[in-house]
């Protein structure tokens, strides 16, 4: 009888954990690929990248937003507004931030600060957070600061602008995280609606830049970004992350996805031949330890 009672809970936990760790892999791929796209020899326009991300997702997920007629009726205006923070505000701030600061600094700030913001918002909304999870969030925060500390102090390089923008992006994603938990929507419904309205809001203000950038960008580069921004970031990562939030809750899901700075550092070693220093390695270890505590895995 006890085994039967525990089994469904264990199954739900496994689904959430799988979704969260898949999200880590997708985010790592996206951060490194996007940094290369906006800071290479021929950087792509961030507005074009945003259009590719949300436009592709809007087409792929069309059946879902069509059934909802674009606006989920069960959501209050506040919840609906909170969901939209995962759209244009988040995407444009990430692209801008990655243009101003290296991925090795922006990555830890973006994903490492998510648990901190989510826990803060949850506490404001009256949700209970265990002490052990708070300790884990503290370790994650220390790890992110350790990795980015040298960059934050070097103001003359201008990286601090990217750091501030990335923190704004993390706050936007955290607002979405808490809003989704209270929305009653499925992962695919939330992703579909966010993509649709982000595309509709972007076109009137960025149409001229989008057309100009499309004409100037090689077809191969466009196809690569359709895969990276549209499929990986616009559809897959949003679905897997939202699924993780559904099964694990906001605090636990964001704690696991805070592993991204560590995985991004490892990816940089093997893909970009960037060997992390002692500070970066220490920060990654702190983040991993914080994730284990804040996620409730042990």
Predicted features and spans:
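Cytoplasmic-side transmembrane-helix entry/capping segments in multi-pass membrane proteins
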Residues: 20-21, 75-84, 129-141, 162-163, ...
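Hydrophobic/aromatic residues within transmembrane alpha-helices
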Residues: 37, 49, 53, 97, ...
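Specific alpha-helical transmembrane segments that line the substrate/conduction pathway
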Residues: 48-58, 95-128, 169, 250-269
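Membrane-interface helix termini and inter-helical loops of multi-pass transporters
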Residues: 32-43, 99, 148-159, 207-226, ...
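Hydrophobic transmembrane alpha-helices of multi-pass small-molecule transport proteins
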Residues: 61, 129-151, 202, 258, ...
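Transmembrane alpha-helices of multi-pass small-molecule transport proteins
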Residues: 2, 42-89, 117-121, 172-176, ...
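Specific transmembrane alpha-helical segments of multi-pass solute transporters/efflux pumps
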Residues: 25-31, 62-110, 146, 230-248
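Glycine-/small-residue-enriched transmembrane alpha-helix faces in small-molecule transporters
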Residues: 2-51, 142, 152-182, 200-204
